[in-house]
Amino acid sequence: MQTNSSLSEATGSACDPLTRAQILIEALPYIQQYQGRVIVIKYGGAAMVHQERRAEVLRDIVFLACVGIRPVLVHGGGPEINSWLQKLDIPFKFVDGLRVTDAATMEVVEMVLVGKVNKQIVQLISLAGGSAVGLCGRDGNLIKARSQGRAEIGFVGEVSSINPQLLQTLLEGGQIPVISSVAADETGQAYNINADTVAGELAASLGAEKLILLTDTPGILKDPQDRSSLITLLDIETARQLIQAGVVKGGMIPKVQCCIRALAQGVRAAHILDGGSPHSLLLELLTDAGVGTKLVPSQFSAQLEGLNNGSR
């Protein structure tokens, strides 16, 4: 099976057989802990843009499914949308990090995310030996949207409600749901919703073990210019303090807020990590040290994580 290469690649080709065996043993308790649990993964950034990384990340997701973990994949597709808007000579701009989405732009967004990017991901999962079903919020009334109420950004929406039953049925059948962040309101009007937001709300609705945001940075950094200043573990209150202090800023703010909201609704842990780093998903989930930032609900949870030998 093609997924056999995922963990061996993550361990490094130069490792001797004994070292590889030790790494597999290190992964075992995590595999046992997460078996049968839902993990919602937001897939975007460099992990989607670069062909090699894209195939690698999806192969790692198939690996997780093969060992009994239940991944749900939510994807963006900003660069692909930009490319098609340029091809169609449709100007685009952003306000507060949100794509201004008029009727023409919304049509392209839905075409690209639902009809192109989503199906490409499903196909790549199939090629990696997995079985996936592509969906958007419209399908099976999975996600209902509503307007954000800001005329200047057009058809940019937020999640109104979620019907998790469809996803639960797919997961029980061994499928990997692949979800694009397009949904409609009660009148059928389509909305473009931030994929991080969709992932967080789905994680809460499904009672997920984890929410994972694959980004273009290693996680939350004390110094954005220093990748070695990674904060590996923090709780909701500390995360809020970092936002107020300006340590968390720019595009990282909505990602951290998304994690905070998911944790407040019962998700056990949220992770922010670099999706462009080789096998970061496996290393974050299945090793003691991890490679990104882990957020937990409370200081007590953080202390407990520390006592558990840095458990991810």
From Swiss-Prot:
Stored Gene3D superfamilies: Acetylglutamate kinase-like
Database matches in PANTHER family: N-ACETYLGLUTAMATE SYNTHASE, N-ACETYLGLUTAMATE SYNTHASE, MITOCHONDRIAL
NCBIfam families per the UniProt record, alphabetical: argB
Species classification: Bacteria, Bacillati, Cyanobacteriota, Cyanophyceae, Synechococcales
Protein known as: Acetylglutamate kinase
Pathway: Amino-acid biosynthesis; L-arginine biosynthesis; N(2)-acetyl-L-ornithine from L-glutamate: step 2/4
GO molecular function, one term: ATP binding
A Pfam family assignment: AA_kinase
Keywords of this entry: Amino-acid biosynthesis, Arginine biosynthesis, ATP-binding, Cytoplasm, Kinase, Nucleotide-binding, Transferase
Primary residence: cytoplasm
Biological-process GO terms, alphabetical: arginine biosynthetic process via ornithine; L-arginine biosynthetic process
Domain of life where this protein originates: Bacteria
E.C. no: 2.7.2.8
Enzyme class: transferase
Reactions catalysed, as given in the entry: N-acetyl-L-glutamate + ATP = N-acetyl-L-glutamyl 5-phosphate + ADP
